[in-house]
Amino acid sequence: WIMGHMVNAIEQVDEFLDLGANAIEFDVDFDDDGVAKYTHHGIPCDCGRLCTKYAVFTEYLDYVRQVTTPGDPKFRKELVLLALDLKLQRIPSEKAYAAGVDVATKLLDHYWMRGWNGGRAYILLNIPLVEDYEFIRAFKDTLRKEGHEQYNAKVGINFTGNEDLDEIREVLEKLGEDEHIWQADGITSCFPRGTERLKKALEKRDTPGYKYISKVYAWTLVRSSIMRRSLRLGVDGVMSNYPDRVVKVLKEKEFSDKFRLATYADNPWEKFTPI
């Protein structure tokens, strides 16, 4: 999975897909009551990027629904995963539940259309800190109450704050979640980062019977050398400001027979087992 990073304006969606991304990450900004208002990162953000691009959250969902609905004139078959970078760290933890209800409801109304020809992409809920775990509970509760639990099959969870992996597992256990789990490791592209925690996450992913990580990705990679380093370690995905650079690296002899771009037929919740 090549994840385009910080794709917050509607016109950027096709821009990043044209560069080779098959997944996009966008920031979801909340008001003080936990209502999702905009796709917006704000200042500061990654080096060399404009931090202020935004869209109204529901309008953004309407657009990506079209892009991921077969038969729609805007359909792009390559876009298979939407990662919502939920800016919950900007609101009080006690509002995390309200935020989960709101995001689930807006996805039902604007993306899935409650079963009426909605978008088909998989959804990854990126949660900054384990203390905001009530968001997940609220999201699942809302799908259940609204009678649309079928969408759980499309939804995964990912804690992105580089917290202790065992602490993350404990929170997932508390929530009763042991599938559809991704693990991100990374830092803003402005700073270097070692591979110690990334290696630990990959080790857990590859431990037979370990359920709490099915995919691991590194973010936000801009240098080809760091992309190569991550691929050598065996990541499932790379988040980048420059998807075209990832595409180029994947074509190199060292990687071209080991990796390929994920398509809609690839299940993002299953561990990859090499043949």
Curated annotation (Swiss-Prot):
The active site is at H5, H41 (nucleophile). The keyword Secreted applies. GO terms for biological process: killing of cells of another organism; lipid catabolic process. Keywords: Cytolysis, Dermonecrotic toxin, Disulfide bond, Hemolysis, Lipid degradation, Lipid metabolism, Lyase, Magnesium, Metal-binding, Secreted, Toxin. GO terms for cellular component: extracellular region. Expressed by the venom gland. CDD domains: GDPD_like_SMaseD_PLD. It is found in: Secreted. Disulfide bonds join C45-C51, C47-C190. InterPro entries: PLC-like_Pdiesterase_TIM-brl. Its EC number is 4.6.1.-. It is an enzyme of class 4 (lyase). It comes from the Eukaryota. It catalyses: an N-(acyl)-sphingosylphosphocholine = an N-(acyl)-sphingosyl-1,3-cyclic phosphate + choline; an N-(acyl)-sphingosylphosphoethanolamine = an N-(acyl)-sphingosyl-1,3-cyclic phosphate + ethanolamine; a 1-acyl-sn-glycero-3-phosphocholine = a 1-acyl-sn-glycero-2,3-cyclic phosphate + choline; a 1-acyl-sn-glycero-3-phosphoethanolamine = a 1-acyl-sn-glycero-2,3-cyclic phosphate + ethanolamine. The keyword Secreted applies. Its cofactor is Mg(2+). Binds 1 Mg(2+) ion per subunit. Dermonecrotic toxins cleave the phosphodiester linkage between the phosphate and headgroup of certain phospholipids (sphingolipid and lysolipid substrates), forming an alcohol (often choline) and a cyclic phosphate. This toxin acts on sphingomyelin (SM). It may also act on ceramide phosphoethanolamine (CPE), lysophosphatidylcholine (LPC) and lysophosphatidylethanolamine (LPE), but not on lysophosphatidylserine (LPS), and lysophosphatidylglycerol (LPG). It acts by transphosphatidylation, releasing exclusively cyclic phosphate products as second products. Belongs to the arthropod phospholipase D family. Class II subfamily. This is Dermonecrotic toxin SpeSicTox-betaIIA2v. It comes from Sicarius peruensis (Six-eyed sand spider).
